UniProtKB/Swiss-Prot annotation:
Phosphoserine found at: S45
GO-annotated cellular components: blood microparticle; haptoglobin-hemoglobin complex; hemoglobin complex
InterPro entries: Globin (IPR000971), Globin-like_sf (IPR009050), Globin/Proto (IPR012292), Hemoglobin_b (IPR002337), Hemoglobin_oxygen_transport (IPR050056)
Gene: HBB1
UniProt function note: Involved in oxygen transport from the lung to the various peripheral tissues.
The protein's name: Hemoglobin subunit beta-1
Family classification: Belongs to the globin family.
Residues found modified as Phosphothreonine: T124
Species this protein is from: Chalinolobus morio
Amino acid sequence: MVHLTGEEKAAVTGLWGKVNVEEVGGEALGRLLVVYPWTQRFFDSFGDLSNAGAVMGNAKVKAHGKKVLNSFGEGLKNLDNLKGTFAKLSELHCDKLHVDPENFRLLGNVLVVVLARHFGKDFTPPVQAAFQKLAQGVATALAHKYH
């Protein structure tokens, strides 16, 4: 569960309604793979990830980024039950994929950077703080199976 004030919920949901999930998702996952290259080991089947241009232009990265952001959006609809919302994904990433749960936090931080880039002055410090809190809540929910 993530505790957002009424103002924070309004800020997050208001901005989320303007997010191009395909564009932002692809960029966020792409940046994760470029900035933290060790995360690429989970995406061997994605083809060429040899440099930033290849990663950012990779159709599979973009498609998976969209999928990731759609899941994040589901979390927004279920703020009071993030652990339940992400239980199956947590189990998959822990038991089958063996993803380091720290990667969830890194992706959340990258998502905040990408949102700031896309929304500029509308991504005020209070909006950033609310998204950072939400990203941490989602990362914690995804890491739940690991505990």
